[in-house]
């Protein structure tokens, strides 16, 4: 077996981030003491559990966010994202985008955000074009379909992208069919940046998609659950301002990029702004204690924290990619982001699985499989050092 989940008891003894509260009539003072955090984590057989490289949401949140949440814990604000902290966060996101005219809304998670945005845009007879590997097509339990809208998959490139030519061909195939009114009408194009396979759309590719969507009367929606890791990849030539200019709506992912939870939807097309908060509420995305989302994005967009922690994760992933390459591994798909997809002999994976969690990705042949090794804002040098060393070791055997 290549990937064996382990059931574990987790026993944590904390001597860090101790919150010492001294309250007064005016404020609460919080002091954080930094010390070593000890974790004893054992599986059912008593051995230490694994180091996680399977995804980018295994940790909590960046310490700046945790500190700010504690500092503001007893603050009283209005609810549902209409507080002053959410307003500050929106202002910082608008500044980062270089656009004061965009609407910014905070939701809780990625699947909820995708379903809410797509359902808000489409009429009942319309569907969303997506890569066949797209998150809405394969990893959202039919969430978009549950809103009454069909996902229309297109074959993707090895790194998970679709092209402007594919979109135009799908549109023309529909309008030129004599029975077009008997089929779901493509009206929205869904892509993610980065893609599920770690691919990046270049500015030229996004421009081509934007242009074909404009010609065909389609909306372009960009899923940015891992946007920070895409924007900070050295190979990237796209900025937030470009996303504003080339898409109708996109979102800035927080859950996978330093936040406890949260996604920031940026609506650039004025036609899509009306009544969007109704849709958020209807889909269960309007958090009563909305300031918790505002606090997180306010911190992430203070002093470029969002981009700094993303860039660090990409650097760590590059180290892992080099270790795999040096050990003789091929790759399932090229990825310049925090997700890497090396191909290992199954025997090597069995050895790595004794110490590390990874995501099984695809069977390559009878004796080789592709896996995903994923870094995050919280990935440590020590864990990357250990993984790189062990990759070299198992591949040398």
Residue ranges and their predicted role:
Residues 53, 162-224:
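Active-site phosphate-binding strand-loop segment of PLP-dependent enzymes
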């Amino acid at each position: 077996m290549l990937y064996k989940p382990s059931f574990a008891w987790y026993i944590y003894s904390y001597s860090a981030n101790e919150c010492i509260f001294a309250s007064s009539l005016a404020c609460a003072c919080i002091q954080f003491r930094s010390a070593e955090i000890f974790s004893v984590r054992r599986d059912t057989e008593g051995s230490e559990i694994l180091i996680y490289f399977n995804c980018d949401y295994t940790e909590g949140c960046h310490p700046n966010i945790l500190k700010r949440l504690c500092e503001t814990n007893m603050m009283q604000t209005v609810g549902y994202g209409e507080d002053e902290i959410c307003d500050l966060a929106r202002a910082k996101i608008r500044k980062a985008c270089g656009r004061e005219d965009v609407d910014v809304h905070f939701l809780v998670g990625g699947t909820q955000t995708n379903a809410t945005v797509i359902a808000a845009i489409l009429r009942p007879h319309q569907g969303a074009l997506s890569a066949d590997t797209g998150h809405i097509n394969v990893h959202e339990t039919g969430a978009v379909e549950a809103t009454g809208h069909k996902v229309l998959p297109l074959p993707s490139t090895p790194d998970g992208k679709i092209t402007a030519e594919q979109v135009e061909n799908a549109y023309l195939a529909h309008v030129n069919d004599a029975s077009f009114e008997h089929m779901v009408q493509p009206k929205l194009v869904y892509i993610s940046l980065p893609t599920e396979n770690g691919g990046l759309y270049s500015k030229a590719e996004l421009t081509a998609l934007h242009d074909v969507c404009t010609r065909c009367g389609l909306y372009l929606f960009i899923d940015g659950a891992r946007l920070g890791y895409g924007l900070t990849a050295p190979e990237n030539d796209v900025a937030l301002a470009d996303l504003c200019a080339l898409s109708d709506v996109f979102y800035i992912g927080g859950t996978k990029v330093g936040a406890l939870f949260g996604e920031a939807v940026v609506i650039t097309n004025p036609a899509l702004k009306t009544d969007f908060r109704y849709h958020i509420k209807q889909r269960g995305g309007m958090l009563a204690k909305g300031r918790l989302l505002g606090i997180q994005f306010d911190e992430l967009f203070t002093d470029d924290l969002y981009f700094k922690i993303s860039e660090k994760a990409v650097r760590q992933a590059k180290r892992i990619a080099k270790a795999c390459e040096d050990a003789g591994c091929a790759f399932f798909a090229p990825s310049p982001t925090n997700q890497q997809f090396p191909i290992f002999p199954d025997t090597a994976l069995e050895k790595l699985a004794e110490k590390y969690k990874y995501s099984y990705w695809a069977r390559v042949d009878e004796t080789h499989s592709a896996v995903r090794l994923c870094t995050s804002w919280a990935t440590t040098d020590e864990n990357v050092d250990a993984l790189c060393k062990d990759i070299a070791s198992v591949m040398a055997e």
